[in-house]
Amino acid sequence: MYKKIKGTDDIYGEDMKYWYFIENTAREITRLYGYSEIRTPIFEQTELFVRSVGEETDIVQKEMYTFKDKGDRSITLRPEGTAPTIRAFIENSMVATGLPKRLFYIGPMFRYERPQAGRQRQFHQFGIELIGSSSSLADAEAIVVADRFLKSLGLVDYTIKINSIGCEKCRAEYKKKLKEYYSDKLDKVCDDCKRRYNTNILRLLDCKVDVEYVKDAPKITDYLCDNCKKHYEETKNILDKLDINYEEDPLLVRGLDYYNGIVFEIHHGKLGAQSAIGGGGRYDNLIKELGGQQTPSLGFAMGIERLIIAVKKEGIPVEEIKNNEVFVAHLGESARIEAIKISEELRDNGISVVFNTMERGLSAQLKHASRLNCRLCLIVGENELERNVVILRNMKTGEQIEIERDYIVGTTREWIDEQ
């Protein structure tokens, strides 16, 4: 027997209502803010992610699913959604239709990580990209969209953490101070931090092993240039005026190399040590880095599996999927075709119908309808058809009535609306 690959999930049945809930909410919130959906390929050229995410990041070094295709090209299953979106923006000359460009995506991503609750090797993200604005209004909008989305899900136990990691100018001085701070600790830090000390010193602040050194490290907010400091203060001021709750975290740097300026993460209080449910920030240099014109941009992404756990932990009620409103049972050879016609009439009027396609008696058909959680059952029998009637049965209460053939659709709709 074949089994699913480790780190993947089959999503079906009761779980689907959570996926519909989160995806539908994401689409509604992005609609309110003028974002359009984009769907990019699941695999891209490997170099796209090496160039954008950063050669020394854990994602590129350890986590990417990379392979050679039959044309000997290096291909990678996308580990995140921003780089493919920006590649599509450049390749399709979206700048020609005007800026800023607001895009969102929902889809699977792939990283070779140790599977654990809410963290799979194939996982799903909802993300937005706001391309073309350097204003603090854009930074605030991204955070406001994230906050409204989470509130619309009914979540309350979350924290938005924000920081500014500055520009290349102010980061240069900060990196010097950070190197000085860690210079006498290199024999004590983890192997990853030893390597990052010379390749990307900022990534030491993202270490989950040497946390005692991280908390005492110099704060980048003390080294921001005037422009970055002004941008950070303006963004916070807008969030304050909009009553958006957030916490400043001067050690927040994010795990991808393309970020600059404002960065933020969202953590949920009921998810334990792995509490992050999303994050994002500015990436003003990424489009130029990937071959386009210098274009200020920012965005965020959230893990859908993590969001589902958060929704369940907070006990948020999620509406059942109302797929199976009516089960149509039939008895006798001559009743089959009429039962099919009745089913199609109901569907023509927007009523979902499950039609019996098995050789079963009435008792077995009713039992199957109950398993499917059908609300009503229409019983089409030869004897009833001779009298030009069918039987409509409430599957929850057992109440049933006879309906004349011409009134089936109207009466069925009334019974559905009453429930």
UniProtKB/Swiss-Prot annotation:
PROSITE patterns (UniProt xref): AA_TRNA_LIGASE_II
SUPFAM superfamilies: Class II aaRS ABD-related, Class II aaRS and biotin synthetases
Keyword Aminoacyl-tRNA synthetase (UniProt): yes
GO molecular function: ATP binding; histidine-tRNA ligase activity
Location(s), subcellular: Cytoplasm
EC numbers: 6.1.1.21
InterPro entries for the chain: aa-tRNA-synth_II, aa-tRNA-synth_II/BPL/LPL, Anticodon-bd, Anticodon-bd_dom_sf, His-tRNA-ligase, HisRS-like_core, HisRS/HisZ, HisRS_anticodon
Organism: Thermosipho melanesiensis (strain DSM 12029 / CIP 104789 / BI429)
Domain of life, per lineage: Bacteria
Name of the gene this protein is made from: hisS
Subunit-level organization: Homodimer.
Broad class of where this protein is predominantly found: cytoplasm
GO BP term, example: histidyl-tRNA aminoacylation
Similarity field: Belongs to the class-II aminoacyl-tRNA synthetase family.
Alphabetical list of Pfam families matching this protein: HGTP_anticodon, tRNA-synt_His
Protein name: Histidine--tRNA ligase
GO cellular component: cytoplasm
